[in-house]
């Protein structure tokens, strides 16, 4: 299903008044579209508060980004683990009440994570760039900014907050967006993790080329249902192309036990992204070690 980037009849603001013409298509058709529409509004507000030029100056003073892809490639364990710092989600609500991102990040680092993923979406995941900044100051592992990126502006936000990599979701971006955003990310020193969920999206990304790190999301973002068979099906269908382009494949979502990791690794995933399974445990370090070593 095509995801509309903004409402067909957006609200218009005149002075202190806001109005819109009601229309049957004015409501989002699924969760992902709802998130995208809200994100579009958030970006507009953020750009007013901090113009791009200010972000450029911040980024210019930063040390080089850490090698996210290199850390996954060189991981001592397989599959390599990207451990996620996540407080909540649209489908599960609050996942961790006692949310201390610094303590969680340090536990992940001690527990054997190769990289970390940090949710920066505030409206639906209760994250934020402030969380990313806190985690960056606490650990030395490469960090992924996990958000719904619709504008190059967000890549600057991610880098300014200390990210070493950024997520690009194929379902909400055109081919032109993917190619352009990848160039902007490269200029900023950011690694790109391109996320796909179905054969059409993976075919698009492989046809574009130049994306050595691809994530297969086992969660359908329109319904938030998960199925590990998604990784198995897509890796089998595109095995030759994935090998030819030397893709490092990440399986994302729905991974709760060592058997789940073994299953997606057998399908061809060299890394996994795990969040909820760890965030629900009192001792996240022990939970991560158990997931890695069984």
Curated annotation (Swiss-Prot):
Family assignment from sequence similarity: Belongs to the TrpC family.
Record pathway: Amino-acid biosynthesis; L-tryptophan biosynthesis; L-tryptophan from chorismate: step 4/5
InterPro entries: Aldolase_TIM, Indole-3-glycerol_P_synth, Indole-3-glycerol_P_synth_dom, Indole-3-GlycerolPSynthase_CS, RibuloseP-bd_barrel
Protein name per the record: Indole-3-glycerol phosphate synthase
EC class (word): lyase
GO molecular function, one term: phosphoribosylanthranilate isomerase activity
EC number of the protein: 4.1.1.48
Domain of life: Bacteria
Entries under Pfam families matching the protein: IGPS
BP GO terms, sorted: L-tryptophan biosynthetic process
Catalyses which reaction(s): 1-(2-carboxyphenylamino)-1-deoxy-D-ribulose 5-phosphate + H(+) = (1S,2R)-1-C-(indol-3-yl)glycerol 3-phosphate + CO2 + H2O
Keyword set, alphabetical order: Amino-acid biosynthesis, Aromatic amino acid biosynthesis, Decarboxylase, Lyase, Tryptophan biosynthesis
SUPFAM superfamilies associated with the record: Ribulose-phoshate binding barrel
